[in-house]
Amino acid sequence: MVVLVAVLVLCMFAATALAGGDSAKNVIIMITDGCGYNCVLATDYYQYGAAGTQVYERFPVQLGVSTYPAGGHYNPYLAWTDFNEVGGWAANRVTESNMAATAMGTGYKCAGGVGIDEHANRVPTIVEIAEQLGKATGVVSTQSFAEATPAGFSAHALDRKALKSIIEQQLRESKLDVAMGAHNPWYNNNGEKLETPYFSDTSKYLWKESTWNDVVAGKIGNDADGDGEVEYWDVIESRADFQAMATGPTPERVLGVVQCGGEDKVGSGYTQFYRTGAANDAPFTVPFLETSPTLSEMSLAALNVLDNDPDGFFVMIEGANPDYGNHFGWLGRAIEEQIDFNDAVEAVIAWVEANSSWDETLLVITSDHETGGIWGPGAGVGTPAAPSASRFIVKPDQSVFVPLVNNGAGQVPGHLYTNHRWEYGPDFYWHTNQLVPLYAKGAGASVLTTQVRGVDPVRGPYIDNTDIFQVTRHVFTDGAVPAQVGNN
């Protein structure tokens, strides 16, 4: 009977076709990587000692989002009866950041790469569509601007880790007006300048030296606005540069490469996460680097450039590292990164209210996926079959979803990570197929509620991550294009 009811509910809430009448001049999508419902809640508890305390948790539109990749599914009944339904990491079960970003940025599910469908065909991104509409566009991240999430909105590649190729594409071919992130080849993970920079003409992960030198010298660009003239990139690097860019006149195109993270040989780079001494600590036990801008400072710099366009803009802003905190089982580190993200959300809200309005700007807050399977102590009663087991195995009748323990403000909540990935070590955890939260406010926000796919027994109504693209494109075009483009 329960299964039948679930099926009927899913049918009743099938996504409806989008109609005209809702439009937005600007769309801001803010993504906290690897932060599901319990990561948000843990940060609430740590910051304020109570749930529901972030400003976005009072937004008028709040939904769940399914995140599965091509070939996957989300079953709201099984999700709450069997840990294995949302755990593990089979290719068609649990998404990666690149796949989730591609879904949100193109409306297509994929099985790998960025900006492609499940058959490896190149598909239009929302950045490209916004550019066709005459809008300014940007991507901002606390890791490399060529990494999975920003790349999924702004590039096309079969290999998500072909960062050298993605950088070339973003700087030389795309019409992006803003690209900001870390992985500066001249600086280590502590923001200290290197005697020998990390360049390579062969490694797919690292900057090509000639590209770096040319872009810093103002020699790379293309016709980004269709006026027949080349718009070259202006490069900013220091925290003071980012802070200054937040006010006053700006160049037409800005590449911000934070002075940090160049020694990450797999190209991710981070503004804060790999600073020396920071491990499984309470938040900010090792203070954030003073040399790296906060995500708030990066966001305000980007907005000050993008709002020069009278036709409006699209920007994706990512807080990248709740994900890695949760991968290592370091909840305190995930919380400090989420606090940085929360501060950025508040800064963006203040910017909208001072420089735009909710009548013309849509703000969407969400995540690409949950990481770690975070629950309270005692969750998932049962033990892995063996230390080398391929995934955390729990029988359905043993699945216990224990809430986090609120230890009060300033204290890390009582918790347990449940989704081990054993081949990476006993204390490494992976993405899950749990729903993630979405919060929205502003022009066209209510359109998201027309795309509800089903009702989760715990999280309530939910949409799919591909619907974020559909709604973004819809509010930009006021329904002037066919509603369904994706293959979901």
What are these regions (language model features)?
Residues F13-A19:
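Sec/Tat signal peptide C-region and signal peptidase I cleavage site
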Residues A24-V27, T32-T102, A146-G486:
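A post-motif C-terminal structural segment
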Residues G113-D117, V139:
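General structural concept
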Residues I116-P124, K161:
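Glycine-rich anion/phosphate-binding loops
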Residues I126-E131, I349, E353:
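Surface-exposed amphipathic alpha-helices with a cationic face
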